[in-house]
Structure formats: structure tokens, C-alpha cells
């Protein structure tokens, strides 16, 4: 049995085929880049119909090349926190708000949760612009057209493709409206959002499986009999794909953005363990949660620096970074895109310090990259407090794969913990497939975890 793994991210849509051993089939990959609208006013949106077209293009490409012939299951890793308003016909009334969008703010006349700590413990989130409790009223006020209901981007896309497209437990937890214990919409969170149950997606039961609508079964006949598994949040998928599936290992992932996360078994309808005040908690599925912190900055800082600072190319840049002494980096506030919850800094809050006429582009880059490392430390300590022991750290993500120097910098900052590098290139797809197959326990064997690079040149010594 082959598995089609879809990665519905913010910057790209990807589809790849995995074999029965959850290994990528060579060559069976299609990818389309997504055009985001990002502005200094905090805008971070994308076009839902354009996104759907990119997904269709990926499926067309894989189908035309014969890669879908033996696919029996579709697994999905999807961005958390996106939302768009829909009309009575189920079509978008405006663009999709992604996690990047920092514009939504509560009404000055609206009070927040009656007991903020209890709200945080129950939903794993805060009354914050990243979550639907703040986003939905803001969307209503700015839409200009009456909104019939709201959906995440993945629910909208699947509603066009499948005969049925309820919201998975994992995706629902990212809205901030879900009670993580009872796995139903939280009444207080819904009241803050100004919605009733009928304006929200239906929640998927644990055994839900979808199938293509007849028109798309004819378009992709080799997928006609495939079962579609509930989507899981991309962060949860990355943890599983990294082999970080229990309380002994934390995943630090740096892609476009960055995050530190710990996965734990916490079945539904069982009281949840206490949650530290600065951390969020979302669902992987009905049996597991992922706890952690996420940051707006990661590989996007490198992309900005590469575009603006005229950096050396490839190997020359890596060599220049290794040649720096620890004091050569420049201090940086890396909140270029603002804060993710629970912080409230807006986009445009980044700063560079310690500049002189002798400061080099490589020194500026090193300061930015160290800033990404250092933001993880306090939140990792908070995660460790929930398990009362130091954890092993597994680095992963595209930005980590691209820079041995950055991996070594992380190892130095996070010492004396053991820090290793997950070399598997498809951690999100692999994680989603493992969850869909009920094989989370196999994740460690598949993760291909190796040692980090020499720490001495990029560490804190």
C-alpha cells in the first residue's frame, strides 16, 4: 500500500508518495509555491482559490506521471490557525488569514475570558489575535458581506474535493476554540468569538475517512478508492516525523518560522496535566497532545538577510560563519514579523544593535541566527518543567538541513543537553502518514537521527 502525503503549508503545497514502509518513493514529488500577501501593517494573507488550484496542479502532476496508481490512503499535514469567511454558497468572501497576520485585535469594549488561566488550561491557548476567539469578530467587522460560517484553509480545500470534510481534532485545537479534554467547542471561547456551533466546521469523529467527490474521482481515477485521513497540524506532524513522540525528546524545528515542541500521551476525557503560562497546547489526535512555543522568525530571517545584505554564496557563506569568533555576532531583536502567542509585538518590531562602519553582512546574519537559537532556551526550560527532567533535543526542518553552522550554534546555546539532528528530509509528510496509519510508535526507527556538527566554532565558548 502506498500513501499520498499532502503538506498544505503557508509558503508551498507539496504532494509526495510514500511506500508501505513510510519511505518516500523516488521521484514521486510535486510542489507549487504559494504567493503570500505580506505587508508592514501586519497583513499575512493568501488567496483560497489560488491555493486550491496549486493543490489540483500537484495532484494532476502526480496522476499524469503514474505515481498515484497504488495509493490507498491520503495523509495530510496542514498549517494551523488559518481562517477564512464563507458565504451561503460555501465560497470565500475574502482572503485567508494565515498565522502571519497580526492585524486582528479585540474590540476595546469586549472583555476577555472570565478566568484567563482556566481558559488557557482548558483550550491550550489565549485570547489572542492568532486564534479564532479574536479573529472571527475582526473578520466580521472587516468583511463587508454577511458571513455564513468560518473555516480553516484545509477544511475549505477538502470541502471542494471530498464528499465530507469535517474539521479534525488536531486542526480544531489550533483555532483556540476547542476544549482539549472533552474535544468539543468550548462555550466561553465561542462566545468570545461571537459564533454558534452552526457557524463553525463540524468536528470529525475518530474513525472519519473521506473519499473524493465523483467529479474528482473521474479526474484522478487512481485516487477514487483511496481513503483520506483527518489532517493534523504541521507542528504535530513534524514532531512525529522527527521521532519526538514522548516526554524524553523535544523537537526544535526551523523552517520558514521556528518552534520548540514536546509530544505527550494525554487521552481525551482524562484531566490534562498543568500547562505552563507561556506555552500553548494542541491536539495531535484523540490520544496525544503537543505542547510548546512557536516563533514568527526562523528561516525567513535568513531569506531576508540573503536578499538584502549581499551575502556570499553557499559554501563561501558557511565558511565565513565558521570563521567568526563568538563576539563577532551583533545583538538582534528578531521580531521582524511580530510575536506569535502569547506575545503581542506587531510586525515591524525587529531591531539590529551594535552596528559600526566595520560591521559585516556575515556578522549581522550570525546575530540573527543566534537570535533564533536563544529564543528557544526559556521555553525549553518551561517544557522540561512539565516532565521534571532535561530532554534530548532533535533539530529538524529545512533551515537546519541547509546550515551545519546553525545546527552547531543551536547545540552550543542548548548545552549541556544532548542535541542531535534529524536528517530525514520529509518529517512533516512522514509524521502525517504515521499518524494516519496508527503507527506513531514506529517514528523513532524512521527518523534517521544523527549527531550535530562540531560545536566548538559556533557555540558559546
State what each model feature region is.
Residues 63-99, 126-130, 158-179, 202-205, ...:
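Short beta-strand-loop/turn "lid" adjacent to the catalytic site in phosphate-handling enzymes
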Residues 32-37, 97-105, 172-173, 256-258, ...:
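Short, acidic/turn-prone active-site loops that include or flank metal/cofactor-
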Residues 64-67, 196, 386:
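Extracytoplasmic/secreted proteins and extracellular or luminal domains
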Residues 4-5, 111-124, 130-166, 177-187, ...:
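Active-site core segments that coordinate phosphate-bearing ligands/cofactors
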Residues 193-206:
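A conserved helix-loop-beta module that forms one wall/lid of the active-site cleft
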Residues 47, 101, 234:
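Short, conserved phosphate/pyrophosphate- and ester-handling motifs at nucleotide-, phospho-/glycolipid
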Residues 1-95, 121, 141, 201, ...:
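N-terminal glycine/serine-rich phosphate-binding loop of ATP-dependent small-molecule kinases
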Amino acid at each position: 500500500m502506498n500513501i499520498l502525503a499532502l503538506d498544505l503549508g503557508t509558503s508551498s503545497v507539496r504532494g509526495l508518495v510514500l511506500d508501505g514502509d513510510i519511505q518516500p518513493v523516488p521521484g514521486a514529488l510535486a510542489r507549487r509555491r504559494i504567493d503570500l500577501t505580506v505587508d508592514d501593517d501586519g497583513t499575512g494573507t493568501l488567496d483560497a482559490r489560488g491555493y486550491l488550484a496549486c493543490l489540483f496542479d500537484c495532484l494532476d502532476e502526480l496522476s499524469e506521471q503514474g505515481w498515484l496508481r497504488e495509493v490507498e490512503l491520503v495523509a495530510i499535514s496542514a498549517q494551523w490557525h488559518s481562517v477564512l469567511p464563507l458565504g451561503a454558497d460555501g465560497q470565500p468572501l475574502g482572503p485567508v488569514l494565515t498565522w502571519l497576520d497580526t492585524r486582528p485585535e479585540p474590540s476595546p469594549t469586549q472583555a476577555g475570558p472570565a478566568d484567563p488561566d482556566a481558559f488557557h488550561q482548558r483550550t491550550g491557548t489565549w485570547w489572542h489575535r492568532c486564534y479564532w476567539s479574536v479573529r472571527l469578530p475582526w473578520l466580521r467587522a472587516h468583511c463587508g458581506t454577511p458571513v455564513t460560517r468560518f473555516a480553516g484553509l484545509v477544511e475549505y480545500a477538502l470541502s471542494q474535493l471530498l464528499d465530507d470534510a469535517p474539521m479534525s481534532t488536531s486542526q480544531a485545537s489550533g483555532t483556540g476554540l476547542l476544549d482539549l479534554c472533552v474535544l468539543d467547542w468550548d462555550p466561553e471561547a465561542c462566545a468570545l468569538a461571537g459564533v454558534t456551533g452552526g457557524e463553525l466546521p463540524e468536528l470529525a469523529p475518530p474513525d472519519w475517512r473521506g473519499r473524493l467527490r465523483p467529479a474528482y474521482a473521474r479526474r484522478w481515477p487512481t485516487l477514487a478508492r483511496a481513503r483520506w485521513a483527518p489532517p493534523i497540524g504541521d507542528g504535530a506532524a513534524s514532531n512525529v516525523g522527527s521521532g519526538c513522540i514522548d516526554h524524553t525528546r523535544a523537537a526544535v524545528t526551523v523552517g520558514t518560522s521556528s518552534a520548540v515542541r514536546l509530544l505527550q500521551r494525554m487521552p481525551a476525557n482524562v484531566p490534562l496535566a498543568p500547562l505552563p503560562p507561556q506555552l500553548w497546547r494542541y491536539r495531535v489526535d484523540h490520544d496525544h497532545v503537543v505542547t510548546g512555543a512557536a516563533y514568527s522568525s526562523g528561516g525567513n530571517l535568513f531569506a531576508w538577510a540573503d536578499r538584502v545584505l549581499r551575502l556570499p554564496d553557499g559554501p563561501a557563506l558557511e565558511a565565513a560563519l565558521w570563521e567568526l569568533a563568538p563576539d563577532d555576532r551583533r545583538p538582534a531583536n528578531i521580531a521582524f514579523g511580530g510575536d506569535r502567542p502569547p506575545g503581542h509585538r506587531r510586525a515591524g518590531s525587529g531591531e539590529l544593535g551594535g552596528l559600526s562602519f566595520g560591521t559585516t553582512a556575515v556578522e549581522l546574519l550570525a546575530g540573527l541566527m543566534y537570535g533564533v537559537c536563544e529564543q528557544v532556551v526559556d521555553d525549553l526550560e518551561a517544557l522540561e518543567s512539565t516532565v521534571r527532567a532535561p530532554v534530548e533535543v532533535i533539530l529538524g526542518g529545512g533551515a537546519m538541513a541547509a546550515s551545519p553552522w546553525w545546527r552547531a550554534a543551536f547545540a552550543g546555546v542548548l548545552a549541556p543537553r544532548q542535541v542531535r539532528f534529524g536528517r530525514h528530509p520529509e518529517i512533516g509528510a512522514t509524521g502525517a502518514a504515521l499518524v494516519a496509519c496508527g503507527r506513531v510508535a514506529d517514528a523513532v526507527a524512521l527518523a534517521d537521527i544523527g549527531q550535530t556538527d562540531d560545536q566548538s566554532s559556533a557555540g558559546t565558548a
